[in-house]
Amino acid sequence: LKSKLIQPLFVSESISSKQPLESLPGQFLFSKDLLIEEIELLLNLGIKTIALFPNIPESLKDADGTNALDEKNFICKLVSEIKDRYPEVVLITDVALDPYTVSGHDGIIKNDVVDNDLTLEALKKMAVNLAEAGSDIIAPSDMMDGRIGVIRGALEQSGNKDTIILSYSAKYSSNFYGPFRDAIGSKKAEGISKANYQMDKRNIEEALKEAELDLQEGCLLYTSDA
């Protein structure tokens, strides 16, 4: 059972302590040093898979989330350090711009809406940077159309063929994400709805459609002689 567990960890470069997350009871925002200690504790418990979520200082956020594209940003350097210390750890990193944008949205806003194609260009750069840093699994949570195919292509072209994509295929526009947004310090701007790119909870068929599209864009099948 332990081998199947994934521990989410929230981390910030702007703190030096372990702070409880009021909106997520039992979870904490870690400094880098204390995060490393937490990972060692988890390994001793037999938990080897970690999902990392950065809480980005407001000073590093902008309209386009450009810090997410910096190959030397905090999360990329942290991924490399973790993999150097604990190569047995399986690291999952999130691919979306919401921790990095002042709007708190998952993509780049043009004319008051998230520009899907412009955002895809940013996401593929972000994904490659995280893979190059040592991420074992890339987890796109942005819900842009066509992102899995674009990211898969970018990973292949950059030589990161073994990097796994774990897609957030079905992500609904819901207030239930509030606690998570608090944890990563993402504040949604007024007047812009994530319903532009996340799914309507009333549409019960769209989740299956989105999952099928992700499979078409990023699923790799090996042939068998059997």
Regions found by a protein language model. Give the residues of each.
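Active-site beta-loop-alpha junctions enriched in small/polar residues
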Residues: S12, N55-P57, A96-V102, S141-M143, ...
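Conserved anion-binding
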Residues: Y100-S103, R147, G153-D200
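Conserved small/polar residues in nucleotide/adenosyl-binding loops
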Residues: Y222-A226
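Glycine-rich anion/phosphate-binding loops
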Residues: L24-L41, G65-L78
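Structural preference for beta-strand elements that scaffold enzyme active sites
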Residues: K4-P8, T49-A51, V90-I92, D136-I137, ...
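Active-site mouth loops of central-metabolism enzymes
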Residues: K18-D33, G107-E121, E190-L208
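Conserved, mostly hydrophobic/aromatic
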Residues: L9, L35, D94, L130, ...
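Alpha-helix-loop-beta-strand connector modules within alpha/beta enzyme cores
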Residues: G65-T93, I148-S169
